[in-house]
């Protein structure tokens, strides 16, 4: 049996595995909402975008900001956060936006919910590239030079921890409530389950991990851009 151990082959395998770990987290986060709670949302890309931009904005070194924000005098953010706090904050910002739009959109059903969340993602993509927000988001220009990861194990560890947390949530009393809502909302409400509370929890949790996944993808790609 001949195995090609060339640097190119190992590099390609590493790339595929890293991207696979990141997308595994994104798929599991989406499955929490679509599969276990029965909410057909297509807004995951928007929350990934929020996570990627939040992480990138917060971790660009101060001395590099003038090069990244060359059209906006170095931007308005003039500090650099450590990697892990910035990663958590990336998820938190995505969850915050999910909470803001959750109250109106989670009252919609089926295709209407899908259209509303997809519309949110597209509007967000356009807003981030708005010239007026350039000092923060760099408008339509690429965000780069932010903190990446040194070890290829990093995305596997982060994704593994996040997926484990999601699995624990699914197997908890909250997870059983999510499944009850998916099967029959009327019966779930008759059993004393607060529909809006649990829908919002599922929506925000899914968005939180989508934001972390978006930040990991930005690190993997070495840049963040609304078109990616």
Where does each model-flagged region fall?
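Transmembrane alpha-helices and adjacent helix-loop boundaries
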Residues: 1-228
């Amino acid at each position: 049996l001949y195995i090609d151990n060339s640097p190119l082959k190992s590099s390609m395998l590493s790339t595929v595995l890293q991207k696979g770990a990141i997308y595994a987290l994104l798929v599991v986060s989406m499955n929490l909402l679509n599969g276990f709670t029965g909410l057909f949302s297509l807004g995951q890309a928007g929350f990934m975008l929020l996570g990627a931009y939040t992480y990138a904005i917060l971790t660009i070194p101060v001395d590099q900001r003038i090069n990244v924000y060359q059209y906006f005098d170095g931007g308005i953010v003039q500090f650099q956060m450590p990697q892990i706090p910035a990663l958590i904050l990336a998820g938190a910002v995505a969850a915050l936006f999910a909470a803001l739009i959750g109250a109106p959109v989670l009252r919609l059903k089926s295709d209407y919910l899908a259209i509303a969340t997809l519309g949110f993602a597209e509007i967000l993509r356009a807003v981030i590239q708005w010239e007026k927000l350039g000092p923060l988001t760099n408008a339509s220009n690429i965000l780069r030079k932010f903190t990446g990861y040194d070890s290829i194990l990093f995305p596997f560890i982060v994704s593994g921890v996040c997926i484990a947390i999601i699995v624990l949530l699914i197997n908890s009393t909250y997870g059983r409530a999510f499944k009850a809502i998916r099967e029959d909302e009327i019966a779930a409400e008759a059993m004393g389950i607060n529909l809006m509370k649990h829908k919002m929890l599922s929506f925000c949790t899914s968005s939180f991990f989508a934001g972390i996944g978006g930040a990991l993808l930005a690190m993997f790609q070495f840049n963040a851009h609304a078109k990616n």
